[in-house]
Structure formats: C-alpha cells, structure tokens
Amino acid sequence: MKGKGRNRAVKSLEIYVRKLAQANGIKPEMAAHIFHLIYEETPNGGISDDDLESLTGYKQSDIRRILRLLGDKRIIVSRKGRHPRKEATRYFWRIDSDTINVSLLTLKKKVLEKLVVKEAHDSGNSYYTCPRCGSKYSFDEAFTLDFTCPRCGEVLEEADSREGLERLRRTIDALREEIARDESRIYRS
C-alpha cells in the first residue's frame, strides 16, 4: 500500500478497530491509540507491550487485551525477542501488510454479503414512510399500525424505493469490483 491508498486503509482499519473494541467492552479511543503506536513502530520491527505501557500509561492488562483482540483478528502479528537488559522474553507487535490485506478483504466480503441480503430483502418488500417525521415501516408494520404513524399520527405513504435500491446495487457492484482487484493483488502468483 502506498500514498493515498495506505492512508485510506489505515483510516478504515482505525474505524474497524474502534468498532471491534467497543463490541468487546474496550474503550475505542484506547484501542485506536494502541493501533496507531503499533502502526508507527512497524517499520522499526514493532513495539513491545512494556513499551506501549510506558508510552501510554495504560494498564498492562488493558494493553494485552487489545493486543490479543487485534492479534485474533489478524490485524497485528508478534515476534519473540529478548529484553536488552533482562533475560526475559518479550513480544514485539507489528502490522503485517500481508495478513492485514487478507483481513480487510475478509471484512469487505462480509459487508458485501450483508448488502446482498439487504438488497434481496428490500427488492422483495414494500415500505411506507411518514411524510411528517420520516419514519420508515415495512408493509407488515404499516398494516399493523393501520397505515398511521405511531409517532405523529400522520397517514403513512408508500415509499418509492427504486432510487435507494439502485444506489444499493451500484454500491454492491463497486464493492465486488474492489474485492476482485484486491484478490488479484493479494493472490497473484
């Protein structure tokens, strides 16, 4: 990854790291901070959890929890090393571009799968919206509500979902093309 592509990938990964942290009961800003420190030290061979602790002031248990989470998702990898002054083994954490590219590709495929399911669902169902507050309801929900908005009492109107579906299909097509490009770049022989 070079230039703008790298910056975009790092930003995408940071968003992913924040969401991953939040879903696992970890402070998102702490996980993002650790991720950025590892990213900055990757060209130098990585950074140890002891160094992360001294740089951030975070508790070692929190740091290790974040490292384990990022490692499990193959965002970072570790290598074993020796402490320069002690005889203890240390682990140095770094971002491995090969595994991270595969992780991003896997994530894109999961997003694509969800979008395809949404497109199939949306194309087979009609929706109703409230012209006053903008609330959206499926046909079944609108039927149950007697086609009256429960928030403001306005009569629900059938929504024209063609434009939204077309936008969703363009997004799906673009993501499929991006996945194909990524696969050819990652798996080229």
Swiss-Prot record:
Against InterPro entries, the record matches this protein to: TF_E_archaea, TFE, TFIIE/TFIIEa_HTH, TFIIE_asu, TFIIEa/SarR/Rpc3_HTH_dom, WH-like_DNA-bd_sf, WH_DNA-bd_sf, Znf_TFIIB
- Protein name as annotated: Transcription factor E
Q: Which Pfam families match?
A: TFIIE_alpha, Zn_Ribbon_TF
* Molecular functions (GO terms): DNA binding
The biological process GO terms on file are: regulation of DNA-templated transcription; transcription initiation at RNA polymerase II promoter
Entry's SUPFAM superfamilies? Winged helix' DNA-binding domain (SSF46785), Zinc beta-ribbon (SSF57783)
- Which residues does the UniProt record annotate as the domain HTH TFE/IIEalpha-type? 9-101
Q: How does the record describe its quaternary structure?
A: Monomer. Interaction with RNA polymerase subunits RpoF and RpoE is necessary for Tfe stimulatory transcription activity. Able to interact with Tbp and RNA polymerase in the absence of DNA promoter. Interacts both with the preinitiation and elongation complexes.
Keywords, alphabetical: DNA-binding, Transcription, Transcription regulation
PROSITE patterns named among the record's database cross-references: HTH_TFE_IIE
Q: Of which family is this protein a member? A: Belongs to the TFE family.
Entry comment, domain topic: The winged helix domain is involved in binding to DNA in the preinitiation complex.
Q: What does this protein do?
A: Transcription factor that plays a role in the activation of archaeal genes transcribed by RNA polymerase. Facilitates transcription initiation by enhancing TATA-box recognition by TATA-box-binding protein (Tbp), and transcription factor B (Tfb) and RNA polymerase recruitment. Not absolutely required for transcription in vitro, but particularly important in cases where Tbp or Tfb function is not optimal. It dynamically alters the nucleic acid-binding properties of RNA polymerases by stabilizing the initiation complex and destabilizing elongation complexes.
What gene is this protein a product of?
tfe
Transmembrane ranges, per UniProt, are none
